[in-house]
């Protein structure tokens, strides 16, 4: 996990940039060799002189050519690599480590604690599971964390005063020291190293029993940029070739035993392997008090934790960065009371999710010339032109499960393991909901939270709404997160009143097939206080007397331009899931794709000849003008200031080309407008750039941050990160990532916040606030519909309806941009073909 990867495409790109220079050097080299061969029969003195002259000429040509390349073609690239990078301030490092631990203290989620087993006093503890010695600290790709100096799980326990069984940890490190690599460039090794149960000798088990009565099992799952987690491990186990329409990612797997396969056909990466299942059986048959720690960002199937009475407690702890695993020791010992809440719905059987047939590898067949364009865009795609259908529409995550349960489509308890917004504490809270109050600032409600237990703790206050649904009309979920907040640390008996404010516009739905605008339909809106998406504490009714349409005369939520239908072209010929008649079309809508014919418009967009659009009457824009302007002159100027046109007229075509072509990890200098060069860097996990040669503290994953439900912590999180960026003279940050957890198999789920758009939006706004406070600008990403990593570079066509796009996938971006109307943020696009969005 600590390896920093260099993209092979970048290497090829640099080689292509200097290809002409390399050809010149190669010709000079061949000429030198030819001369040396020709003069081989000359007199010795003459031969030496000619050979020396030819070698000197070759050397001179090489030096001059490389200097030209460095001064012109590679000028900006070398500037990035060779310029002064600055050094990290130790105070900033110390602050980062503290913030990471603070975030993880609140971001670990306790989902089970039978008989209040936890906390326990620091004592000896047996920690089982290979991942206890090599946990997941982050993800791969842009979210890579340098784990070489990070606090591991065992060290985190020891720092809290626990003593761990070294006989077990020694066995695991001897079994394997390195974690298999899920690489963006070099393939994926999905192996889950685990010592087979048969290899635990009687001595090891008996020694463990003598060491402690308490056992912990650590299991991990990892993911990363460029690929999604396997839905079916069977083809990976047997090395099958990826075929059109199959639902698995490429990769390899090495079994832990020669006696059995770890997975059977049809089992997913998010189920227990046989070796893991055997380990759970072994531990639970020898210990009565077992703690399970799941170290992963993707919502794994954990129904089995209820099948063992020995499993007393379950803790969810995704990639924890440099110091986050201290939080496990803090929580288990009771030094910290867990207050994290889930940001996704966790299922007992993921194969029953509505998206399951519509994620993964799906390729069009009638691609012809488009395949040639795809190969040029990304050679490793092998000409694949792919697609993914967002068939569930707005019914993503809890929006589906809560609504489907209300409509009688599913049995909730049989389907859902942990609701969205769920998490346990060592104490209990009483929440009292006040009356709704309407004012010019919106609608407010006070919630008084009282700690009714005997341990200090924090509580998350969650407010949801259930809009009136008219059968066959605008699609609506029966449960929607409306607002939330987190209390301060409340001592036993202490109370705090939290005020939650929202607007009636927040409850409007986008009416794609009727008004073509946002609409707040008439009727009663149930505003409910809940402990999670499923369990209601109290509710109030808010009535809307008549339909309100947010059109040109009444724009929605501060829109500059009216929100109207703009994305018919993204909808495609897809049957989308509808609540009509109790989800009557569920089977049809959620079935696997049957149409693999590429849309004619997209085919044309991939094969057109741009010269067909040349027009001899077109006039060349003004370039290279002397208008007496510098970029600094327009600092703070509005977007519509006429001087921008004059400034652009001063730039040359070459400068414009270079500004775009050399835009990776920097924003180059432009001499004509006296623009200085500034540095950008990638990654939500902090400074970790092989391109720039700078490395800093590894921050915990964004899902840990989101599970805090604490926006103040999110501000502190990115502000601390921004201080390290500033030490390295970095100004732009390729983050935060705010795509949606559409499925549990998303390779970059660790890098995104949640399945919910509201929670994602609030956390994103907070992170942007922190990074702006540090003097930087973020590149919020990946706009838009970037929920799948498989085939992301293979002309991926994403199909979705406009209501889902606006209410689910656009919302984090929309709310963040609206929060910064002065333009302090940039946007990174996705790779898919829905760029017009």
Positions of predicted regions on the chain:
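Glycoside hydrolase catalytic-domain context in secreted enzymes
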Residues: 1-512, 519-528, 532-533, 556-837
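Short beta-strand elements
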Residues: 535-555
């Amino acid at each position: 996990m600590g390896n920093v990867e260099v993209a092979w495409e970048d290497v090829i790109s640099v080689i292509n940039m200097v290809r002409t220079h390399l050809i010149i050097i190669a010709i000079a080299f061949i000429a030198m060799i030819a001369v040396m061969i020709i003069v081989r029969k000359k007199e010795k003195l003459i031969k030496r002189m000619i050979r020396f002259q030819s070698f000197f000429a070759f050397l001179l040509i090489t030096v001059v050519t490389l200097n030209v390349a460095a001064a012109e073609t590679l000028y900006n690239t070398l500037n990035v690599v060779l310029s002064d990078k600055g050094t990290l301030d130790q105070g900033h490092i110390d602050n980062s480590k503290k913030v990471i631990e603070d975030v993880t203290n609140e971001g670990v989620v306790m989902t089970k604690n039978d008989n209040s087993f936890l906390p326990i006093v620091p004592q000896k503890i047996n920690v089982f599971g290979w991942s206890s010695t090599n946990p997941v600290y982050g993800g791969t790709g842009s979210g890579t964390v340098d784990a070489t100096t990070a606090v591991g799980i065992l060290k985190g326990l020891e720092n809290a005063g626990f003593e761990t069984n070294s006989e077990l940890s020694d066995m695991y490190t001897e079994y394997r020291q390195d974690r298999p690599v899920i690489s963006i460039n070099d393939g994926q090794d999905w192996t889950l190293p685990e010592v087979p149960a048969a290899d635990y000798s009687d001595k090891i088990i008996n020694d463990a029993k003598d060491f402690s009565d308490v056992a912990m099992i650590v299991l991990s799952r990892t993911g990363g940029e460029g690929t999604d987690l396997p839905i079916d491990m069977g083809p990976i186990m047997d090395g099958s070739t990826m075929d059109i329409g199959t639902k698995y990612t490429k990769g390899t797997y090495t079994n832990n035993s020669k006696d059995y396969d770890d997975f059977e056909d049809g089992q997913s990466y998010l189920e227990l392997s046989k070796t893991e299942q055997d380990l759970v059986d072994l531990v639970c048959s020898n210990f009565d008090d077992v703690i399970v720690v799941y170290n992963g960002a993707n919502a794994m199937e954990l129904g089995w934790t209820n099948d063992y009475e020995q499993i007393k407690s379950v803790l969810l702890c995704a990639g924890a960065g440099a110091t986050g695993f201290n939080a496990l020791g803090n929580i288990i010992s009771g030094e910290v009371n867990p207050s994290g809440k889930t940001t996704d719905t966790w299922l007992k059987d993921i194969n029953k999710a509505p998206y399951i047939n519509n994620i993964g590898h799906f390729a069009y067949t009638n691609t012809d010339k488009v395949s040639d364009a795809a190969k040029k865009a990304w050679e490793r795609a092998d000409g694949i032109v792919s697609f993914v259908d967002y068939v569930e529409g707005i019914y993503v995550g809890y929006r589906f499960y809560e609504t489907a349960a209300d409509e009688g489509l599913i049995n909730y308890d049989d389907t859902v393991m942990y609701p969205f917004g769920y998490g346990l504490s060592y104490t209990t809270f009483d929440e009292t909901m006040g009356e709704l109050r309407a004012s010019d600032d919106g609608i407010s409600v006070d919630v008084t939270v009282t700690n009714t237990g005997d341990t200090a703790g924090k509580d998350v206050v969650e407010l949801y709404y259930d809009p009136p649904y008219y059968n066959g009309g605008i699609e609506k979920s029966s449960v929607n997160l409306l607002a939330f907040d987190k209390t301060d640390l409340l001592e036993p008996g202490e109370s705090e009143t939290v005020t939650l404010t929202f607007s009636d516009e927040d409850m409007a739905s986008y009416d794609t097939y009727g008004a073509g605008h946002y609409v707040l339909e008439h009727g009663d809106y149930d505003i409910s206080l809940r402990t999670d998406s499923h369990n209601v504490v109290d509710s109030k009714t808010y009535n809307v007397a008549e339909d309100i349409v947010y059109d040109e005369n009444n724009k929605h939520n501060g829109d500059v331009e009216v929100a109207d239908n703009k994305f018919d072209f993204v909808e495609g010929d897809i049957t989308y899931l509808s609540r009509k008649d109790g989800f009557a079309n569920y089977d049809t809508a959620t079935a696997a794709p049957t149409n693999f014919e590429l849309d004619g418009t997209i085919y044309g967009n991939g094969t057109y000849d741009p010269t067909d659009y040349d027009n001899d009457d077109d006039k060349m824009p003004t370039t290279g003008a002397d208008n007496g302007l510098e970029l600094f002159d327009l600092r703070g100027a509005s977007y519509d200031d006429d001087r921008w046109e004059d400034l652009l007229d001063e730039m040359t075509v070459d400068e414009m080309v270079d500004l775009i072509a050399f835009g990776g990890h920097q924003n180059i200098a432009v001499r004509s407008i006296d623009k200085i060069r500034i540095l950008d860097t990638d990654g939500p996990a902090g400074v970790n750039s092989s391109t720039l040669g700078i490395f800093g503290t590894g921050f915990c994953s964004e899902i840990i941050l989101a599970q805090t439900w604490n926006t103040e912590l999110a501000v502190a999180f990115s502000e601390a990160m921004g201080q390290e960026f500033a030490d390295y003279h970095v100004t732009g940050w390729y983050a935060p990532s705010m795509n949606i957890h559409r499925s549990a198999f998303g390779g970059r789920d660790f890098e995104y916040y949640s399945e919910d758009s509201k929670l994602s939006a609030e956390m994103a706004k907070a992170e942007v606030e922190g990074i702006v406070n540090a003097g930087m600008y973020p590149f919020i990403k990946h706009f838009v519909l970037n929920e799948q990593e498989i085939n992301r570079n293979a002309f991926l066509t994403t199909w979705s309806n406009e209501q889902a796009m606006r209410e689910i996938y656009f919302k984090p971006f929309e709310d963040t941009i609206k929060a910064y109307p002065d333009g302090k943020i940039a946007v990174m696009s996705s790779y898919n073909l829905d760029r017009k969005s």
